[in-house]
Amino acid sequence: MSKRSKALRAADAKIDREKLYAPLEAVRLAKETSTSKFDGTVEVAFRLGVDPRKADQMVRGTVNLPHGTGKTARVLVFATGDRAEAARAAGADIVGSDELIDEVSKGRLDFDAVVATPDLMGKVGRLGRVLGPRGLMPNPKTGTVTPDVVKAVNEIKGGKIEFRVDKHSNLHFIIGKTSFDDTQLVENYGAALDEILRLKPSAAKGRYIKKAAISTTIGPGIPIDSNRTRNLLTEEDPAAV
């Protein structure tokens, strides 16, 4: 057995699989059981009680994490003229129009987020097969199809994340780094949880959040009590809070 496997087994042994941890306790345990030797990411995953095959049960949105993700996103902006210049001034990493669209269609993917002005969406729409499966396709609902490219770039650079339920009814995204303090991670988790609850489809029946877990880049998943939606910065029993 490799040293890495032994470390992961030892980390997993610290987790009570019969328990649902309070968010603060889960964050602490996730950091404690991380076996990476670098500043790994902290991720959260939710299993939702929705059927993503039905349009009225799709869960998709954005949230501005109060403490960011710990990673500065590389932002690509499809724009021309003054808006292209404004995007560059705002800190966009890649800016262009027709030529850039052609590069992306041929496989260029050195970016983490995409913004487009409305006038270019007729052309950008052809990139659906490339950007769609990667969750990068610009969309008015998430603020990434907009004439205000400066606002969009600033929000993404400032820690705005986008999430979308996958075909297995899962949501997963980064909420920070293992170097973040516990409070920062819990507050980021809380901001994301609030938005996910706000977006609950009216057509969804039964329990909305079925499961939730926090994990690090190299570490086990820590099951979270997803019913815990307030007083997140305590480890007390919710019934006693």
UniProtKB/Swiss-Prot annotation:
It comes from the Bacteria. GO terms for cellular component: large ribosomal subunit. The keyword rRNA-binding applies. Keywords: Repressor, Ribonucleoprotein, Ribosomal protein, RNA-binding, rRNA-binding, Translation regulation, tRNA-binding. The keyword tRNA-binding applies. GO terms for molecular function: rRNA binding; structural constituent of ribosome; tRNA binding. One of its GO terms (biological process) is regulation of translation. PROSITE patterns: RIBOSOMAL_L1 (PS01199). HAMAP family: Ribosomal_uL1_B. Part of the 50S ribosomal subunit. PANTHER family: 54S RIBOSOMAL PROTEIN L1, MITOCHONDRIAL, LARGE RIBOSOMAL SUBUNIT PROTEIN UL1M. NCBIfam families: rplA_bact (TIGR01169). Binds directly to 23S rRNA. The L1 stalk is quite mobile in the ribosome, and is involved in E site tRNA release. Protein L1 is also a translational repressor protein, it controls the translation of the L11 operon by binding to its mRNA. Belongs to the universal ribosomal protein uL1 family. This is Large ribosomal subunit protein uL1.
